[in-house]
Amino acid sequence: APGQDFMRF
């Protein structure tokens, strides 16, 4: 989802 790159774990 756009803007959720910090949730890639």
Curated annotation (Swiss-Prot):
One of its GO terms (cellular component) is extracellular region. One of its GO terms (biological process) is neuropeptide signaling pathway. Keywords: Amidation, Neuropeptide, Secreted. In larvae, expressed in the CNS and thoracic perisymapthetic organs (tPSO) but not in the ring gland or abdominal perisymapthetic organs (aPSO) (at protein level). In adults, expressed in brain and thoracic-abdominal ganglion but not in corpora cardiaca and corpora allata (at protein level). Coiled coil: none annotated. The modification Phenylalanine amide is found at residue 9. It comes from the Eukaryota. It is found in: Secreted. FMRFamides and FMRFamide-like peptides are neuropeptides. Belongs to the FARP (FMRFamide related peptide) family. This is FMRFamide-like neuropeptide APGQDFMRF-amide.
